Amino acid sequence: MTKPFILLVPGSFAPETIYASTIAHLRTLGFPAVALRLPTTTKRMPLPAATMAEDADVIKRSVEAVLATGQEVVVVCHSYGGTPTTQALGELGEKKGVRRVVYLSAIIPRVGESNNDAMGGKKGELAFEMTEGYMHIDATTFAPAVCNDLSWDLAYEHTLNLAHHSGASFLEPATQAGYLDIPVSYIFCEKDMVVTPEKQSGFIDVVKEATGKEVHVVKLDAGHCPNWSMPEKLGDVIAEMAGM
């Protein structure tokens, strides 16, 4: 069987480069794979900060581009990335060829909910300031919250890569729900302090209630970013899900 193309959608604040080790491992396993760059993580002065809908458009067009080559695709979305991915896959006119969506400790909004709504108006353990439409991270505080499964020095070095994210994107509601008619898997991070286990269980229930189907779940003994703490193990789990 031909292996599907894996598109990885980053979380908030996250450049595509933070998934490089996992992407490289997937390629060694024979999967074509790439992490996307979201507009909401890119400052583009004098234009305003990008919206969630703009992220969804990038995801949708990327999926369509892969499908146009005749390949099947699996979309893996991390954290905030679950919100625009849910929107993007719902907007697809043709879903044949989208083999699966994999939510990696990700937010799954109901139709009408924003990222913040889905999180109950909370932002986990994140500490940031808002300037000129962008949220900015305090890496000193952020590191132990996101990388609680790494030593503080490594966590700090990693989180220096997380610069800024559009504030507006957290407030825009989803109008589509791609999980309604695409098979769903969830990578559950048991030590996550940002999207907590309680929240992750709630998001899995959102899909169950909306579809009447069970969700395939794999648990990792990891914090919010297994792409840093266990990149190859994460790649192995994604590969397993992509082969379903």
Curated annotation (Swiss-Prot):
E.C. number(s) listed in UniProt: 3.1.1.-
Pathway: Secondary metabolite biosynthesis
Induction comment: Expression is induced on squalestatin S1-producing YMG medium.
Pfam hit, one: Abhydrolase_6
Any GO molecular function: hydrolase activity
Active site: 192 (charge relay system), 224 (charge relay system)
UniProt xrefs under Gene3D superfamilies: alpha/beta hydrolase
InterPro entries per UniProt: AB_hydrolase_1, AB_hydrolase_fold, Sec-Metab_Biosynth_Hydrolase
Residue positions the entry lists as glycosylated: 227
Acyltransferase in keyword set: no
UniProt keyword annotation of Metal-binding present: no
Superkingdom of the source species: Eukaryota
Cysteines paired by S-S bonds: none
Broad EC category: hydrolase
Signal peptide interval: 1-20
UniProt keywords, alphabetically: Glycoprotein, Hydrolase, Signal
Protein family (similarity comment): Belongs to the AB hydrolase superfamily.
Biological function: Probable hydrolase; part of the gene cluster that mediates the biosynthesis of squalestatin S1 (SQS1, also known as zaragozic acid A), a lead compound for the treatment of hyper-cholesterolemia by targeting squalene synthase (SS). Both phenylalanine and benzoic acid are known precursors of SQS1 and so it is unsurprising that the cluster also contains genes potentially involved in benzoate production such as phenyl-alanine ammonia lysase (PAL) M7, which catalyzes the first step in the degradation of phenylalanine, or the NADP-dependent dehydrogenase M3.
PANTHER family for the chain: AB HYDROLASE-1 DOMAIN-CONTAINING PROTEIN, AB HYDROLASE-1 DOMAIN-CONTAINING PROTEIN-RELATED
Protein name: Probable hydrolase R7
Phylogenetic classification of the source organism: Eukaryota, Fungi, Dikarya, Ascomycota, Pezizomycotina
Encoding gene (name): R7
